[in-house]
Design a protein with these regions (language model features):
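Hydrophobic membrane-insertion alpha-helices, especially the h-region
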Residues: 5-20
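Early extracytoplasmic/lumenal segment of secretory-pathway proteins
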Residues: 19-129, 265-266
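Extracytoplasmic ligand-binding site segments that recognize negatively charged/polar headgroups
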Residues: 42-49, 72-74, 78-81, 112-260, ...
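Small-molecule pocket liners
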Residues: 182-185, 232, 302, 314-318
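A bilobed periplasmic-binding-protein/Venus flytrap-type ligand-binding module shared by bacterial periplasmic
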Residues: 187-192, 313-327, 345-346
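Mature extracytoplasmic/periplasmic domains
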Residues: 321-397
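Long, charged, low-complexity terminal extensions
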Residues: 370-518
Length: 518
């Protein structure tokens, strides 16, 4: 209805222009004595509760007064990024800035948020890059975040080497600083594996086992940044050919592709799927939810693992935002996040009385996340709920830069072709069994294998103005990716790719249906 669309449009404008109207469902509001800090976050209510309580207590002990936090939780990190960019663009259009030596300066209090707390390093890096604004007829880069400004000695004391696997723990200029670590691994139902007589998974390749047809739960990489990160880690660890093969076969085993990365852990715990991919704390939290009170974590029917040497470990950062209301208070919150007390909130058991030596851990909620500081593993690992060491598990393979291909290709060969893919996968395995019994089928199998794993070509215009059909391959990846930078060309490519994959899967099914070999 038109009147409904109009109302929604007004509400959207209000959301962009008046950030103080945004409130998390069930979130806390500024109340009580002391200053207030405004934090926009994708973090859960449990994390918000523990960090607000602990920070206020720390601030009162160190600065003489408690603090309240005004949490804003409008959605996931991708949604938050879009919201912030819109608000900062509006501020530039309204002239709420000064241009000093080519840098955009926004005075404290001009913008609505002090900090972005949580989300992966990719999104926080986008905050550091910001956007390009046209000012006085020129394009000027406007970072949304600002450097935290701690001394390098302080950073070295907190982090030591600025590295985990192939990733940074903090942005070198401190536009973002990691506060926790996120792994992207495998969640599985132990009971279902036992009933099937299968060993529980230890590597990503285990999710390609044909016995898992229709039993793997995955999120849609076009909707979930976390699952894209997991798929990217597989490509990085296994390389182009083997990596894409694993992703194709994993997609062929899916029960579904969901838009919500939180759904697979729930369904796996309920026995609706045997295994899937998840962020570590989604997996561990769900395992805890189905564990009997007082039972150890290993007693849960749900398990989670980070495949050693292949898992992508990413910093979960915090960023100070340009023009926020209280920059000094925001900086204190960042400093607090790096204390051992704050780090203990991520992985210690709940301690309602806050008894025992510091750090004392959370009061109510067990967050089941990995601390970012090495000292926690060196001195306090015996107090962890989960016996984890992400520094040992992290893959040390340099990023190959293929992430942008994942939503495009998996969307085409998996999500939008799921029925055809699954039918072809089952047919391919029947052919493999047939060829194993009768070598006369070997040539037919080879053709089916080639069709199943095939990739399309892309028309690319070279510097000479000539159009060439380039195979989507490691060699031609950069050229093909450049085509996708144009929105219209990218949309046409996605349609063509989907048609290509469906035709190839149909070919596999037809080859298997033959009554005679070549």
């Amino acid at each position: 209805m038109r009147w409904t669309a109009g109302i929604l449009g007004v509400l959207l404008v209000g959301l962009l222009v008046l950030p103080w109207l945004v409130r998390p469902k069930g979130g806390s509001q500024p109340a009580g004595e002391g200053p207030a800090l405004v934090i926009i976050t994708p973090h859960t209510e449990q994390i918000r509760f523990e960090y607000e309580r602990a920070f206020s207590r720390w601030h009162e002990a160190n600065f003489g007064q408690p603090v309240t936090i005004d949490w804003r939780a409008p959605g996931g990190t991708s949604e938050i990024r879009r919201l912030l960019i819109d608000q900062y663009r509006a501020a530039i259009r309204n002239g709420e800035y000064e241009l000093v030596d080519g840098e955009v300066i926004i005075e404290p209090g001009r913008m609505g948020y002090d900090l972005l707390f949580g989300g992966g390093s990719y999104e926080h890096t986008q905050m550091r890059r910001g956007f390009v604004a046209e000012i006085d007829g020129q394009g000027v880069q406007v970072p949304i975040s600002v450097p935290a400004g701690f001394s390098q000695d302080r950073m070295d004391a907190w982090f030591g080497e600025n590295k985990i696997g192939n990733q940074l723990l903090y942005e070198p200029d401190q536009y973002w600083i990691g506060t926790a670590l996120s792994g992207f691994g495998i969640i599985f139902n132990k009971d279902l594996y036992a009933r099937a007589g299968m060993d529980t998974p230890t590597s990503f390749t285990d999710l390609t086992d044909p016995r898992l047809m229709g039993l793997v739960a995955l999120a849609d990489p076009r909707q979930s940044g976390s699952i894209t990160t997991t798929f990217d880690s597989i490509l990085n660890a296994y390389g182009w050919d083997e990596g894409w093969r694993i992703l194709r076969e994993m997609a062929a085993n899916t029960r579904y592709f969901t838009s919500a990365a939180t759904k697979p852990p729930l369904d796996i715990a309920a026995g609706e799927a045997m295994a899937g991919l998840a962020i570590d704390f989604y997996g561990r939290t769900q395992a805890q939810a189905v564990t009997s009170p007082g039972a150890p974590p290993e007693a849960s029917r749900v398990g989670y693992i980070d495949p050693v040497g292949a898992v992508y470990i990413d910093a979960d950062p915090i960023s100070m935002l340009r023009g926020g209301p209280s920059p000094e208070l925001a900086r204190r919150f960042v400093e607090f996040c790096m204390t051992e007390q704050a780090q203990s909130l991520w992985q210690f058991s709940a301690n309602p009385e806050q008894a025992g030596p510091e750090p004392t851990g959370p009061v109510q909620y067990e967050l089941r996340r990995a601390p970012v500081r090495r000292v926690m593993y060196e001195q306090h690992a015996d107090r962890f709920i989960d016996r984890v060491d992400p520094f040992a598990a992290a893959a040390d393979v340099p990023s190959r830069g293929w992430r942008s291909a994942i939503p495009v290709m998996m969307g085409a060969f998996g999500v939008d072709s799921d029925e055809e893919l699954q039918e072809a996968w089952a047919a391919l395995w029947r052919l493999r069994e047939r060829a194993a019994e009768d070598p006369a089928w070997t040539s037919v199998l080879a053709r089916a294998e080639a069709a199943f794993y095939a990739f399309p070509t892309q028309a690319v215009v070279g510097v000479d103005g000539q159009s060439r059909a380039l195979l989507f391959s490691e060699e031609h990846y950069d050229a093909v990716r450049d085509v996708w930078r144009d929105a219209e060309a990218a949309a046409e490519a996605r349609i063509a790719y989907t048609r290509f994959f469906r035709d190839r899967y149909k070919e596999v099914v037809e080859l298997e249906a033959r009554s005679q070999p070549d």
